[in-house]
Amino acid sequence: MKGLDEKSTQDRNNLLATTLNYILSKSFDLKQLCIVKGKHCWALYVDVLILESDGNTLDAAVMAARAALSSTKLPGVSVEEDTESESLELSNDPNDSKSLDCSNLPLAITLCQIDSTAYFIDPTKAEETCARAILHVAVNPSGTISFMQKSSDGTIEPSILYDMIAVAQSTASTLFSQFQ
């Protein structure tokens, strides 16, 4: 069974990486990474290392990536143009840097439905395993939903889905207010 567990872990890791990339890239103004329009730009990579998971991994990964990007500083770059080429020179001055605008980066909220009407947020791994349906919702600071995905086989009735979305938005709003 070890091979199956490893494959399952790799599948979960790939899904987490793809989902995290989608959530962040849709909420981040890539223009701020431009050095010379059409020629040079910064490439940012966010690596998330999960040491141990008791469930709700996406929410923690999005929050960690959001915190990392919010504290990222890009060094100043000067562009020196001569007749044949241009060269870029990074500033050695730590004060010559710019922060990234991460004001629109969302938070992810995971909700588990356990029966036709009952659901809750922030599930553990055991709760995720027992859930009828799992819903991941990414909400930006203005309350707009930027991503939503159901990651289970169960169905969610439309009326319950709307309630779950409202709870995700309310929870995200509370969390965003804690960051201020």
Question: For the regions a protein language model found, what residue spans apply to each?
Answer:
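Polyanion-binding surfaces on beta-sheet-dominated domains and ring/shell assemblies
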Residues: 1-180
